[in-house]
Amino acid sequence: MGKKKNSNKSAAAAPAVKHNDRWSSIELGEAKSAAVSHYKEPSKEPKFVHPAKLEKVKRIHDGLNIDRVLSHGPVPKQNGGTKRKHVEVTTQKLENKKPKVEVKKEDEKSKNKKMKNQNKHTALVQNETSTRSTYFVEEPDNENKVTLISNGREIAFKKTEVVESDDEQMIGLDSDEELEDEDETDIDEDEMMIDPKDIERYINFESVEDEEDMEDEEIEDEEFEDEEFEDEEEEADEQEEEEEDVSDEESVVSEMDADSDDEGFIAGKDREAHVISKDKFTRNAPAVDFDKFPFTDEDSVVTSSRAFGFMISPCDVQTFFDKFYQSNVLVVRRKQPTYFGNLFSTARLGELLEKNHLEYGRNINIAQYKNGVRTTLNGQGRAYPQIVKQHLHNMCSVQLVNPQTYDDRIWYLCEVIQEQFGCFVGANTYLTPAGSSGFAPHWDEIDAFLLQVEGRKYWRVWAPESAEEELPLESSDNFTEDDMKGREPVFEGWIEKGDMIYIPRGYIHQARTDSKVHSLHVTVSTGRQWSFANLMEKVVPEAIGVLTDTRHKLRRGLPTGLFDMGGVIDLDYSQEDHFVEKFKMVVDRHMSMLRNLVADQLLESSVDSLAKEFMKQALPPRLTEQEKKLSVLGSSTNLLGDDLVDFTARTKVRLIRRHTQRLLMESEDACFISHRINNSRLFEGRPEQIVEYPISGIDAYRVLSNSYPEWRTLYEIFSLRETKTKSRKENLAAIQLLFQIGVLLVKN
């Protein structure tokens, strides 16, 4: 090596001569920095940072920095995957756009490594305080040969001219005009002179694979990230456009759905009631004894189907739901007065008045319809039998609002039918003296099955006149005779003892008795507040909450000048041209996201929410004596006896009903049982029945639910693959809990 100079001054004064030792040019300050050879001096002007660079995806976390994943919301996208995608795409773009620099390497291995690393993102960092440097050194013996010395490593190159295409866009390198404007030091290819200050500049290559690749990695330009974020903005714009297209398509679909609501609607008299009469050759069925649980089967769903089939017979269940349910009136004329057996009677109503504290308004209504006006004549406090008798003598009708609360037979019928409809089923009874009427024309918010148990009644029923009147969610006010003039009923005729008439929700109806015979009918009602509208009332607020937490655009402020964009009143709004772009289209996109969220993630949980609501409102099951004996309720229990309920391997267990309980998830690691075993027979008369259930017992519950109505021994349950993931102790504790809350039958 040459002799090291002691000062910068002496180094500057030394003649520019060529040396055989390549290191001497560095010591003499004759070597040209690689940074100066290939890159201009960094600009001293403040660098503009695109706002997109500063945006970060915010995670939902609590004060302990624990990431939370919403149970119903989409999982937040991780930055890593998106970043890698943009790096790959943008790098490929750079390869196609950057100038072609033809440099022939003598080291073939280094060439292969460089080709390999061209697809990777390498950061350019300039740190003036670092000690590592990279230099080009001219070979003394060969003017066409240049050696790159980087951190102690040497790579030989042959000098070639840089060939640039005029048609290709410059990416990362400055144009010739920019180099002239920057007053760069001209590069002398013969002497490779360099300013000593440039010696301190260096390039730090960030290795992607290992340290050996560091020497050959390609230097990326400073504009790489700007280009990347421009691509991200373009993709974001494309995504916004796609959302707009989807929103437009869904808006069209929504409009088509709205138009289809009126298609096929048959108004008023054009609808026809269907009357089914019993064939004269069909033998009468024996009278039903409701005290003997006539429809009960091992499977509660089968029990429900039997009871409902009995109520509408001879129409079968499937035909009813296909042809009549919530669409047309069905009249069944059986010519069998004893068909409903001992379901209810006037004598039974007298017993209930005598033995129970029935109050006006709460349990009993007294009504009269005379000269086109309905009058309510309720008293105060308890309705005593003798007072009710006087009202009947005065041509008033008596309505028992909730007979299922006090009468076991009506309770049984309503309770078992609940599993057919999946919602609360209640009842009313109407006792009307001969030659009178108890109510004005009106419609109800429920589907009504009128069972004529005594006397006869003359009915008139009118169908809805418009789609707006179809299937209302609230009862109507009373209509007058003038209101009904000109409207032709879809059904008008007598309903005799043993007959049934089904009146869909929203059909106006009115009835009067025969001048010589009183009338008593039981109305079994279902479907109250049980519609898709009620479902959406529960799901949409939850979906809005989830979407608000996960979509920051929904949390943005409303556009400025909104009040000048539009309104209901036709005014000259100064910014009306911006209404669609800045308001309507944005709202449409949010509605599209809301619709997708509900459809993709919240429908299943909404079923659980409805089941939970059903468990709170539904009637409790009316158990047979055998079911009581095998359940926690007991029957004729000897409190001092030794016959305790024991759980052994041979003990058989079974759920008490298919839909008496529901296992619900509160979170990923917590669940509970909602049930109706202890519900009041008065609508929502007791608090909701909820019991915490161990998460370890889900598999055991699943086995019991899937095997219903079959009995399974504990040995069979514990031997199944589903339950072997938990210990027998955990499974047994979960099963015992089901017995303790009353939803499990146990047979030793």
UniProtKB/Swiss-Prot annotation:
InterPro entries: JmjC_dom (IPR003347), NO66-like (IPR039994), RIOX1/NO66-like_C_WH (IPR049043). Residues 399-543 form the JmjC domain. Residues 65-135, 160-264 are annotated as: Disordered. It catalyses: N(6),N(6)-dimethyl-L-lysyl(36)-[histone H3] + 2 2-oxoglutarate + 2 O2 = L-lysyl(36)-[histone H3] + 2 formaldehyde + 2 succinate + 2 CO2. Residues 124-134 have a biased composition (Polar residues). One of its GO terms (molecular function) is histone H3K4 demethylase activity. Its main location: nucleus. Pfam families: JmjC_2 (PF08007), RIOX1_C_WH (PF21233). PROSITE patterns: JMJC. Keywords: Chromatin regulator, Dioxygenase, Iron, Metal-binding, Nucleus, Oxidoreductase, Repressor, Transcription, Transcription regulation. Fe cation binds at H442, D444, H509. Its cofactor is Fe(2+). GO terms for cellular component: nucleolus; nucleus. SUPFAM superfamilies: Clavaminate synthase-like (SSF51197). This is Bifunctional lysine-specific demethylase and histidyl-hydroxylase NO66. Disruption phenotype: Attenuated response to heat shock stress and reduced survival after heat shock and oxidative stress. It is found in: Nucleus. One of its GO terms (biological process) is negative regulation of DNA-templated transcription. Residues 94-110, 194-203 have a biased composition (Basic and acidic residues). Residues 163-193, 207-264 have a biased composition (Acidic residues). Oxygenase that can act as both a histone lysine demethylase and a ribosomal histidine hydroxylase. Specifically demethylates 'Lys-4' (H3K4me) and 'Lys-36' (H3K36me) of histone H3, thereby playing a central role in histone code. Mediates response to multiple stress stimuli, including heat shock and osmotic, oxidative, and ethanol stress. Binds 1 Fe(2+) ion per subunit. Belongs to the ROX family. NO66 subfamily.
